[in-house]
Amino acid sequence: ISLQEIDETGVQQIARALHLNYIYYPGTIHPTRHRYFGPAVLTRWPIVETRKLILPHEGMGRHQRRNATAATVNVRGACVRVYAVHLENQFRASARTREDQADTILADAATTSCPVVVAGDFNSWGIGRYFERKGYGWPTRQVGKTIAFFSWDHIFVRGLDLPDSAGAGQFEQVHGASDHHPVWATLIPPGHTGAMVSASR
């Protein structure tokens, strides 16, 4: 599970309720709530390595930097690198700025031979084409609108496939937990027949 704009109390409560391991790296102080917030990775699998990636460029107006939270997870003896991501929004940054931020994540992912999952709020649909050009699969390409009129929440993968019997989609009911509709994908490593990883944001 990849979460964005969450504080320490929130991620602890969710992890405790669902009996999940987690890693959370706050990025900045929320401008109205005045609490640290940032992205988190939650998983039922053991977390063996973590890191915080500081993304380039400050958002216009707020002068805050975004970050990504990365975790290497041991899934049945195999490693998977997972990134929880929240790129700068459309009103505070250009498409080129978001591509620069994506490049920081892609460069870090290039250092591992593990399969990779990059999930979160990208504040863009077009950023998916950028990930595709970099060799990533885009299982959530067709999930539809995830906030208002926009499709901004996505999952990108390297070294993992979609099983024929499942795929990707979004949760219609959020019960007030977010203004976004979370997306999900069920993924398997090449050459396997059973689901190995279920990713959501």
Language-model-detected regions and their locations in the chain:
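A long, amphipathic alpha-helix that forms part
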Residues: R96-C114
